Amino acid sequence: MNLYRQSCLRAIIAFGTALVLAMGSASADAQQPTDYTALGLEDLMALDVVAINVLGTHIHPAGQWMIGYEYMFDNMDGNLEGTHRVGDSRVLDAYNASPTDMTMQTHMVTVMYSPTINLTLMGMLPYISKSMNHVMRDGTRFNERTEGPGDAEVHALYTLFSTDNLRHRLILNGGVSFPTGSIDRSMGGSRLEYPMQLGSGTVDLMPGLTYLGQNEQMAWGAEFDPTFRLGQNGNQYRLGNRYRLSGWGAMKLTQSASLSGRVDAESWGDIRGSDSALDPTDEPTKDVSAQGGRRVDLMVGLNAYFPSGGLKGLRLAVEAGAPVYQSLNGPQLQTTWLARVGLQWAF
């Protein structure tokens, strides 16, 4: 692991340690409610033990604003074809170069507002940094880097159903992604491959459905949120549709802190069409038939919420995990581990 990745990992661990200390401090002043069923939505948010990055959980009281920041780190190392590991030499039998490893960092800024108790509006804008290493047939190694804004998203979350005590809720998500991320990134005068571009280049529909369950000590739920690409982009291709299904459970450690576990399953298709500036025989990352796949991630997280005091409305979270299953239309780089750090403030 290079120094850059070590620095990222140390930062995540340091944040997690600080989070645990903060949770302990917050719990010392917290008081246990005596009648859970009498609590309103704002009080339920103080009890909420759901992971910060589950989109459908962001339902807020009428008139409330929330701003958020999330840092996401994805590490990829080695190639898979189906579920089998493929060495560089085998990749180089078919292509001029082989990707060896890649990192992706995403800084996501989110703004939310709830005009009514049943409706939350949300806007999201990512800033993405990518780095990919390669090896050529003659043993030459090289690196490619790119960074910039990704595709902006807007969402509307609407409560379709809720029990009187709010222990069971069904949330509908209507989302749209706009092509603000570049699909024309180049390096050394050559167009970068598909995974190194920053956006889809198309308007994408992002519907979703979320179930939330919660009692005094636990929370659970499931979410389905596909992404449908509309038409081809300006470079005459479109990314494959994505289908994501998540299930989670969480248990309170203190009145203000929780431990969560999440299973995240995702499937995505190959690219339709092709960018004429990319030679598919050059490397698999330029081959439209080597872009799809399926993956199941197992994530564990710590979450904290401050319902009162000087940090009232502040929510902190750290989550990390790794794939437990991958099958890729390869050869394609496999994901080895992921980490998420989030900060949100409601007012």
Which residues does each predicted region cover?
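Residues that define the transmembrane beta-barrel architecture of outer-membrane proteins
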Residues: G63, T103-H107, T146-A152, H168, ...
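Outer-membrane beta-barrel biogenesis signature
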Residues: A30-V91, N165, I171
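Extracellular loop and loop/strand-boundary signature of outer-membrane beta-barrel proteins
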Residues: V54, L92-A97, R137-E144, L192-Q197, ...
